[in-house]
Amino acid sequence: MKKLLTGLSAFLLFSPLHVFAADGALSDTALGTTLPLWSCIPFAGMLLSIAIFPLIKEEWWEKHKPWVVAFWSLLFLIPFAVIFGGHIALEHLIEVTLGDYLTFIVLLFGLFCVAGNISLQGDLTGNPKVNVVLLLIGTLLSSWIGTTGASMLMIRPIIRANKWRQRKVQIMVFFIFLISNIGGCLTPVGDPPLLMGFMNGVGFFWSLNLLPVMLLNVLILLTLFFLIDTKAYKKDIADGFKPEIRPESERVKLHLDGAHNIAFMLIIVAAVILSGVLPTTFPVFSEGLTIMGVTLSYASIIEIIMILASAYLSFKTTKKEIRDSNHFTWDAIEEVAILFIGIFITMIPALLILKARGADLGLTQPWQFFWITGALSSFLDNTPTYLVFFTTAASLGFSSGVQTLTSFIPKVVLMAISCGAVFMGANTYIGNAPNFMVRSIAEENGIKMPSFFGYMFWSLSCCLLYTSPSPR
């Protein structure tokens, strides 16, 4: 693998790219129109590697994961550079790493660090009723501190409460459905696609229109979870597994250790909001550091500084014992950082094609927008996917509805796009960043999570239930 990567890198460095380069700079639309569908093969290879290698060669995968990511990334970048020119390839590489990946991974890192310094302690026994309450609390938090923030805050208390359980994979799966995805649909803070809508003129509290849809889906999923978890709970009891219940005099009341870190989490949430508000309120913040035509805005730089400062101060002001009680390690964030840089790079052609040809799909009905946005958000980054169909809907010439910066979008169409992007991120481990984080943390704590395809079996089985009441 290393020799192959060395050869690919040498070819990229010494090949006469300028001879093959396309004349002049191509716009994203021109690139998307020109790119063939087979240019998405490295992206498909990346997804299949994530799905298959952990099943057939787990130890090899853990050791060589970075090399696999580098292989698929170069397999896209080299032909792309040869055909369209090294300058264009480098520009898109910088755009996806500096413009998208950097803020993405910094946000995850910050929330991961701060949440790891908060520990819910006390006697809390995991059973179906308690688990439903914990999932509901996390779901309601998701829209106000983000799906990633809520996931990182709630994952360890739920794992700790159910430590005695033997059958608990369903808890983690529904955790991803509810807290890591569906719960984030009520505000722009909840999930990045809605923040993108807010930046394009949709009112901050408009997403509250999704409350009835969210409540119905949450009710369906919590009912289904309660039935599944009750069955698993009874089997655990029948097999002789019981929670340790201490005498009344020895019980510890529920309390938060490291509670001051909630302030740092709120600072991170404020940083995300500011990154969306500042450029539209004060245009100077949309300017910034420019490299190869790609600008990292001052608003994004402020966001990054606030997040990293919060993470640093969180560690400096929190005792190590609290992290130890959470079994805190860096493995989960390291895995997400490695895999998602490959996903971001290899999905460049897929997003370019979607941006160029999305308007040609003939979408007019809300149900069409819901399903196409949702299906693509399951595998692509749901933020640009949302933006593509948001723009497509805005270009259809509607004369009434939700007013955006450029035009009107009917309320039910915007609801369909929003629900598709947010809800369907639950369909795969890569549909939304918290999904993979939850999976990694669960496995660190001894919970054997489903494989990539095994998880999809869970999600698609439930998909028929939680999408049936969505906008049409």
Where are these regions (language model features)?
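Membrane-core helix-loop-helix motifs of multi-pass transport proteins
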Residues: 165-231, 237-262, 437-465
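Interfacial loop-to-helix junctions that mark the boundaries of transmembrane helices
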Residues: 27-38, 60-67, 91-102, 204-212, ...
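Conserved small/polar residues in nucleotide/adenosyl-binding loops
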Residues: 466-471
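Membrane-interfacial helix-loop connectors
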Residues: 79-81, 142, 152-167, 171-173, ...
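N-terminal secretory/membrane targeting signals
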Residues: 1-22
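Transmembrane alpha-helix boundary signature
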Residues: 79-96, 112-126, 144-152, 350-356
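Hydrophobic mid-bilayer segments of alpha-helices in multi-pass membrane transport proteins
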Residues: 39-50, 64-81, 101-110, 136, ...
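Transmembrane helical segments that form the transport core of multi-pass membrane transport proteins
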Residues: 267-388, 392
